[in-house]
Amino acid sequence: TQHDVEVVTHEAGHAFASWTNRKRIPTSYVWPSLEACEVHSMSMEFFAWPWAEGFFGPDTRKFLYSHLAGALTFIPYGTMVDHFQHIVYEKPDMTPAERNAAWKELTGIYMPWVNMNDSDLPFYTEGRRWQRQHHIYSSPFYYIDYCLAQTVALEFWAMIQKDLGDAWKHYMAYTVQGGSRTFTDLLKNAGLESPFDESCLRGVCAAAEQWLDSFDMTGIR
């Protein structure tokens, strides 16, 4: 499935970063902070695009469109997960119904395209979807790291569209640093923008929007 391929290529990014820094001393410098680690993996998903046809055959174009669109819509979703956690941790006495109501309200803000009125899917329409996000239970406040990393991964995606070889040089410049620097310094040393800069998110979204709008949907259902 699409998810299987995304997981394999995602984890390959983590493995590649680990292998690249396997001889680093001290060993605590092999890995950077969590959001920086996720750049390795989420970016590798896009670097693997040239091999997508080996997995999807005639459905390759469908996968490319879905993958990029999903990467974009993940950012508001991931931000919503973080916002939800702030709410429930600040108000630990909330009832289950109040938590569900908070999630439903946030869905309307961050993902207004989601249909919250389908009576056939009460688990979702009642605002209980957050219970499926295991990070909320197992790794509190980790999810925003994925959003930061996804923004950088989209930087790499935009670079790849222009020059794959040059994009890979930037990826290697980022990866070989291991955990020797802070997240923002890793980016700076690799010639990348920081996702904390508004221009970064605006830039990658504009590039992705143009690509998606010009995508030939012929034969795709």
Regions found by a protein language model. Name each.
Residues 8-9, 16, 43, 54, ...:
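C-terminal, non-catalytic "cap/extension" segments appended to globular domains
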Residues 1-9:
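Short pre-active-site segment immediately N-terminal to the catalytic Zn-binding motif
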Residues 11-12, 39:
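Generic detector of well-ordered alpha-helical packing
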Residues 24-30, 53-64, 163-170:
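Short, glycine/acidic-rich hinge or "gate" loops at secondary-structure transitions
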Residues 13-27, 47:
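Catalytic Zn2+-binding segment of zinc metalloproteases
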Residues 3, 28-35, 68-71, 75, ...:
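Short, solvent-exposed segments of well-ordered alpha helices
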Residues 21, 31-59, 67-68, 73, ...:
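Post-HExxH zinc-binding segment in Zn-dependent metallohydrolases
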